[in-house]
Amino acid sequence: MGKKETIGIILITLVLFVWMYFNTPKHPPQPPHPKSATEHSIDSTAAPSASKGGVTEPKLMGREEAASSVDTSALRIYGKVFAPLASGTEKTITIKTSLYKAVLTTEGGMIKDWTLTKYTTWRGQPVELVNYKHKGDYSLLFQSMDGKLIDTKNLFFTTSVPGGSVIDLKNGQTYTLSFALNVDPKDSSYIAREFTFKGGRYDFDSRVVMRNMQGYIANYEYQVTWEHGLNYTEENSVDESSSSTAYAYSGGETISLEASKSGESVKQQVSGNTNWVAQTTKYFTAAIVPLGKPADGAYLHGIDKPLPNNGQEREYYTALEMRYEGQPTQIDSFMVYVGPMDYNILKSYHIGLEDIVGLGWKWVIRPIAEYVMLPAFEFIHSFIPNYGLVIVIFSIILKLLLNPLTVSSMKSMRKMQALQPMMEEIKEKYKEDQQKMNQAIMNLYKEYKINPMGGCLPMFLQLPILYALWAIFRSNIVLRQSDFIWWIKDLSIPDTILRLPFTIPIVGMNQVSGLALLMAITMFIQQKMSVKDPRQQFMIYFMPVMFWVLFNNFPAGLNLYYFVFNLLSIGQQYFLNKKPMEEMLVKATDKKKSQKPQRPSRPVMGNRSMRRS
């Protein structure tokens, strides 16, 4: 759970406790290389043939001839071995599926563009996830024998597929595309990258093939990286950045890294077997998963950067640290997922990827959201296509389930109001002795079987449910851009009805949410109906205003739920208020009397035969 969500939850809890009291850098730096870890066996599967997009060994000019034609700056950066590969002609190949369009480039042998076809940005444009400010992403990083840090994104690969090719994949079809980086034709040393795309799926398989690279890679290690984050897709960059995080899964635990302060640069080295790394925006993710064997570790780096107009952006670097065995041939396999943070899709991989979906605190809120709320939402949605109606019906169902608690709370508050005259008499009688006053009031509660916390405890018990709903409405991509009625066009963000020409400090309020306002109005009406104590009149006004300000920046779905819940509570309160307070006291007294044990009657000893003579 992000910092913003945590602060929100703390504020809600503090407000409710008050209520209870009154009622009672641009490019991230290159990462350091880890120390050697436990060795793993190598998958010896052969590379696909060139006729099927497999690895080829292109013929280049000799090493001495190539080095002499390279400018000195390339030699200084990449060294004599890799400098000749820093120039070339770019070719691109496009892969089209029903879910995305991917553009791959020979410059870096990596992904240049990844556009989702079923999602649009807040501007209505297709979602492009690969950071367009850079050449592309998903590259390799290692140190050469002459101490140069080699990032393959800056080197030119070759492929047998003609440049400009477009491959259309139907659902269920696969296609393998290979790129080769010929390091030295004399000893047939090369690095090959293979991509196997699958129609109808957001993930693709990838292989790194290293042939005769023993004399070129130092430290027996290399990294598989996603270096430049993901493009933002939502209107509010501050809100989206608060959900942007880098993750690694190691030792059965999901490790997260957040660059939560403006201008902050944070990093984390993960040691030991690592099953995946991922980075997220609010609704989308890029994850790299080693297949066959875990990675030796991971490296996470993040930087928070301010944007114009008080905007904010977090850019992350995630890398798997792989062991290079120094064998003549090494093949490492990966699965890469680039797509929506759909809980059900991520969970279907059975590797814990669903942990990156922000569903609240692991031990308290998340189980409620994950195993109760989400299944309930999906079940209702299987019958009703509109998520706004799903929320309304869900609110009604939840109100019915919580009805015993709600009725108990309302009755307790009514009885407390009915006892006010007696309590005033006690306070007047014992105004000089606080201890006797408190004891007399507690005896009064005991006599009428009233729990002084009865009006507050049910609301407190509902807090985990409210937090779980907040997490779902904020992070569930199925609600993204889901409209309801009238002005409510997106249930996952605030339903703005008015833009303010200024921003209110501290709370960051620069717009007015219609549903938050309706929620506050219904809360005021309910408070007005239920609170009669003159000393609590301040709370009648304070609580709705406080909740309006707090909920103003919350998702419309959460405010819709709370609004409907309040409407139903107003109806309950109306019918309860129709009963006179005196009647409630009488009923409490009668119940007390009816529970008193009756004195048993004496047996009638009228039979003469039973008498003593």
Where do the PLM segments sit?
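General structural signal for secondary-structure boundaries
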Residues: 62, 85-86, 96, 258-259, ...
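Generic N-terminal leader/processing signal
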Residues: 1-2, 33, 50, 57, ...
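Juxtamembrane extramembrane loops of integral membrane proteins
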Residues: 21-123, 128-129, 133, 179, ...
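Helix-loop-helix
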Residues: 1-43, 104, 198-199, 206-211, ...
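Soluble non-transmembrane domains of integral membrane proteins
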Residues: 72, 85-355
